């Protein structure tokens, strides 16, 4: 089954380019596009994509606000932030809002396609440098509930960049069980995304910075 993608950007030339690059991969299906955050939230509800590629700077409603709304209302939909310049404030805002990762708009087409597939698989992909930066900037969850041993093992694998399928195979369970467990983990930690859960794992020593997703 193909990965369903919603494109969000207020520049038509960017949308056209993304359509061209992504359309070359038979595993990817573009189901819609939006020009601002408000439209993105509406289309996310209507289309239920697997992944939203979200521009951060847009009129009406910015991408960070839209990301937060989508992640709270549709937690099964992953969001990858798109940015033209790597600005700490914007990237951190996107991660806080629940984005699983981010990409620069000049990212090579192959890397873009890989990142979308990784996001659809629930795979956190951040460089050690970015993880280190986010550890200093993204707030630690307030009074998180304690995780059980099994949940800690799932979180450890998630923080190491394993996909849902890889975690399922490592633990000899079904993929839907992994998704349910991760949902429980996010709820207990009080965080909106796998990325913030992975940061929590590094902070608490469950994994080292070197072990964290790359």
Model segments located where?
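Basic, Lys/Arg-enriched C-terminal extension of HTH/homeodomain DNA-binding domains
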Residues: 187-214
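Short amphipathic alpha-helix used as the core "switch/output" element in two-component signaling
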Residues: 42, 64-76
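Active-site beta3 strand of CheY-like receiver
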Residues: 47-53
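Short, flexible helix-to-coil linker/hinge segments that flank and couple to helix-turn-helix
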Residues: 89-96, 100-153, 206-209
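Receiver (REC) domain active-site loop signature in two-component systems and cognate sites
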Residues: 58
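Recognition helix of helix-turn-helix DNA-binding domains
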Residues: 161-196
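Acidic catalytic/metal-coordinating carboxylates
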Residues: 36-39, 61-65
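Active-site residues of response regulator receiver
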Residues: 9, 55, 83
């Amino acid at each position: 089954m193909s990965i369903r993608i919603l494109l969000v950007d207020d520049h038509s030339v960017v949308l056209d380019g993304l359509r061209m690059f992504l359309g070359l991969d038979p595993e990817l299906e573009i189901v819609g596009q939006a020009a601002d955050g408000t439209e993105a939230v509406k289309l996310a509800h209507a289309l239920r994509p697997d992944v939203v590629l979200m521009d951060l700077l847009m009129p009406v409603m910015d991408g960070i606000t839209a990301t937060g709304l989508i992640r709270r209302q549709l937690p099964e939909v992953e969001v990858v932030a798109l940015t033209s310049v790597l600005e700490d404030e914007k990237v951190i805002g996107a991660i806080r809002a629940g984005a699983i990762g981010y990409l620069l708009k000049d990212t090579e087409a192959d890397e873009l396609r890989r990142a979308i597939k990784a996001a659809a698989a629930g795979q956190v992909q951040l460089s050690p440098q970015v993880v280190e930066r986010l550890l200093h900037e993204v707030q630690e969850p307030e009074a998180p509930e304690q995780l059980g041993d099994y949940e800690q093992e799932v979180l450890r694998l998630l923080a190491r960049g394993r996909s849902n399928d890889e975690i399922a195979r490592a633990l000899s369970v079904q993929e839907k069980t992994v998704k349910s467990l991760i949902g429980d983990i996010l709820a207990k930690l009080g965080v909106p995304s796998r990325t913030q859960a992975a940061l929590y794992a590094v902070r608490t020593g469950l994994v080292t910075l070197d072990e964290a997703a790359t």
